[in-house]
Amino acid sequence: MEKKLTIIIPNYNGLKFMEPCFAALEKQSYKNYDLLVVDNGSTDGSVEWLKEHGISSIFLAENTGFTGAVNVGIKAAHTPYVILLNNDTEPEKDYVKEMVRMMETSPKIFSVSCKIIQMYQKELMDDAGDMYTVLGWAFQRGVGQ
């Protein structure tokens, strides 16, 4: 049985990205997920669009940035796994399935990330995941490759 998870999407004035992102999520081969958008005080019609489409959302009064929004979403999630997904992404159909599969390979795994392809230069990577030093400094792998 598939474990349930929550996909958390932070949004700030990202109305133009909503339809492609949600269309890609509808095509996912892994279906056992909740979707939660945390809106950072958008003024571009995002709030109205989310309400019109009945998408589970939390509406913040001001822009708290990516970290603030996803932390609100994580606190609201009640599933064993969460996926943090930018609103300007169009994940491939097995994205969620593969993320869960990797998490399930070992109880020692705390988090997984995926290879992100640039939106406008699809032959280049935007990022192949973040790595952290023992001091907590983060750095990205694969940028521009």
Where are the model-predicted features located?
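Short aromatic/hydrophobic "clamp" motif used to bind/position activated sugar donors
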Residues: 82
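Active-site beta-to-alpha loop of glycosyltransferases that engages the nucleotide-sugar donor
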Residues: 9-20, 41
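Conserved donor NDP-sugar-binding/catalytic core segment of glycosyltransferases
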Residues: 90-132
